[in-house]
């Protein structure tokens, strides 16, 4: 027995050393560490790379102040002293407000530049991209071969949109004809619309757009038989490419596209393409690893999704985002059969951000709260500087947790919603809900991804794009 004692001591020491190496003790703020076998950063839950003691050492107490609590197209103003509106909502809504110092922050930080930036001084129409904001459109004298710009765009014309997508920094872009818009927390950002060719280096109109929800957050624009891929606003080398080369089985001249995340790093990202009365589901073969994304700014949209993995909703995420086991394109299906309440043909589509039901104020508190500010999409980094990333890459206007709505209900001038019945706001359980937006003509629909049915609200869907997304006046309020 005595000869075994030294071996036992050595084994115990080895176990202690290994446990120390694989522990999160003292590592919770170091970020991703390529030299370690397990990780202790905020995204390790998504990548399934956490050390065994991550929860005990690093995971903060679950608080619901760092998540969205409503879909982005619902925002209610609770104000006892102002005019009542006769609209009553029947969806799960409620949420934090936009802080009033955002615009001051934007003005006070001129060094925080937009993500999009030119690839070269004067790019040809299809090989570069420029900043969407902060620089003047290039004079036509720099491009004598270009056609003259089309007639001035009318914001509230009611014409259909070609595409909607949110960029990796949380900015929301809408495309219509030759022009694109950037939408902020209220309506359209100052200086827009701009010609698509002056912002993205592509001659408009485009057919569809989406941004992948992974750590890289690359944006894809589709036109005819080709597609363009951008990273941090710069066109990737060797683009444009044929759709048939990059998305086998997807037709040319698509009408719309929307992207969904993988439920975890072991899952697959999906994109839905829509054309005519049919849609196609495409699954990506790979998603970038955490190590591959260390050299670039992290997608704020993906970061919000990935950090929600810490709150033990794995089963629900699998239900929402679990795809087929094989990558590639699925056979086309009919829109009207699988997306209940959506018209048989759509012009544009976009995935909304995930919000958490069951977090709205109780009826007794609802009318005491005043939510003065509103926003369609808003993401804030929870990571600090632990990864050594450039935190200025995100738009100042989307640098804090904003309210969960677009400007739908909040942009109706003096109409206030202080007569809501709030009992429906708090369901029996608290769980994530993913919305999908479909745009058709001058109207849009919001669909619950889990049920694939149009949400029931009053006033009902479809609703006006111009009124609720662009800040145009409601009929009778001109």
UniProtKB/Swiss-Prot annotation:
GO terms for cellular component: alphav-beta3 integrin-vitronectin complex; basement membrane; blood microparticle; collagen-containing extracellular matrix; endoplasmic reticulum; extracellular exosome; extracellular region; extracellular space. The modification Phosphothreonine is found at residues 69, 76. Residues 365-388 have a biased composition (Basic residues). One of its GO terms (biological process) is cell migration. Residues 133-143 have a biased composition (Basic and acidic residues). Changing residue 76 to E: Abolishes phosphorylation by CK2 and enhances adhesion and spreading. GO terms for molecular function: collagen binding; extracellular matrix binding; extracellular matrix structural constituent; heparin binding; identical protein binding; integrin binding; polysaccharide binding; scavenger receptor activity. Residues 1-19 form the signal peptide. Expressed in the retina pigment epithelium (at protein level). Expressed in plasma (at protein level). Expressed in serum (at protein level). Residues 91-158, 364-398 are annotated as: Disordered. Disulfide bonds join 24-28, 24-40, 28-58, 38-40, 38-51, 44-50, 51-58, 293-430. Residues 20-63 form the SMB domain. The modification Sulfotyrosine is found at residues 75, 78, 282, 417, 420. The modification Phosphoserine is found at residues 130, 137, 312, 397. Residues 362-395 are annotated as: Heparin-binding. The record marks 398-399 as: Cleavage. It holds the Pfam family Hemopexin. A motif (Cell attachment site) lies at residues 64-66. Residues 97-112 have a biased composition (Polar residues). Gene3D superfamilies: 4.10.410.20, Hemopexin-like domain. Exists in two forms: a single chain 75 kDa form (V75) and a clipped form composed of two chains (65 kDa and 10 kDa) (V65+V10) which are held together by a disulfide bond. Interacts with SERPINE1/PAI1, insulin and C1QBP. (Microbial infection) Interacts (via hemopexin repeat 2) with P.falciparum (isolate CDC / Honduras) SERA5 P47 (via C-terminus); may form heterotetramers of two VTN and SERA5 P47 heterodimers; the interaction may protect merozoites from phagocytosis by host monocytes; VTN glycosylation appears to be dispensable for the interaction. Vitronectin is a cell adhesion and spreading factor found in serum and tissues. Vitronectin interact with glycosaminoglycans and proteoglycans. Is recognized by certain members of the integrin family and serves as a cell-to-substrate adhesion molecule. Inhibitor of the membrane-damaging effect of the terminal cytolytic complement pathway. Somatomedin-B is a growth hormone-dependent serum factor with protease-inhibiting activity. The SMB domain mediates interaction with SERPINE1/PAI1. The heparin-binding domain mediates interaction with insulin. This is Vitronectin. The gene is VTN.
